[in-house]
Amino acid sequence: MDTRLLIVLLPIIAAASWAIYNIGKILLLQLTKRS
């Protein structure tokens, strides 16, 4: 594994996981609000 590639990929993976986490949290709030 190239170190430079890892340095480039890390922020992208972090941003993607943060977005997925936020979307999941919003979805859970919407689901709990309905019931």
UniProtKB/Swiss-Prot annotation:
Cell compartment(s), UniProt: Plastid, Chloroplast thylakoid membrane
Gene Ontology terms, MF aspect: manganese ion binding
Transmembrane segments: 5-23
Keyword Membrane applies: yes
Lumenal topological segments: 1-4
Signal peptide (from-to): none
Keywords recorded for this protein, A-Z: Chloroplast, Membrane, Photosynthesis, Photosystem II, Plastid, Thylakoid, Transmembrane, Transmembrane helix
Self-association state and partner proteins as the record states: PSII is composed of 1 copy each of membrane proteins PsbA, PsbB, PsbC, PsbD, PsbE, PsbF, PsbH, PsbI, PsbJ, PsbK, PsbL, PsbM, PsbT, PsbX, PsbY, PsbZ, Psb30/Ycf12, at least 3 peripheral proteins of the oxygen-evolving complex and a large number of cofactors. It forms dimeric complexes.
Source lineage: Eukaryota, Rhodophyta, Bangiophyceae, Cyanidiales, Cyanidiaceae
Stromal side, ranges: 24-35
Name of protein: Photosystem II reaction center protein Y
GO CC annotations on file: chloroplast thylakoid membrane; photosystem II
Organism per entry: Cyanidioschyzon merolae (strain NIES-3377 / 10D) (Unicellular red alga)
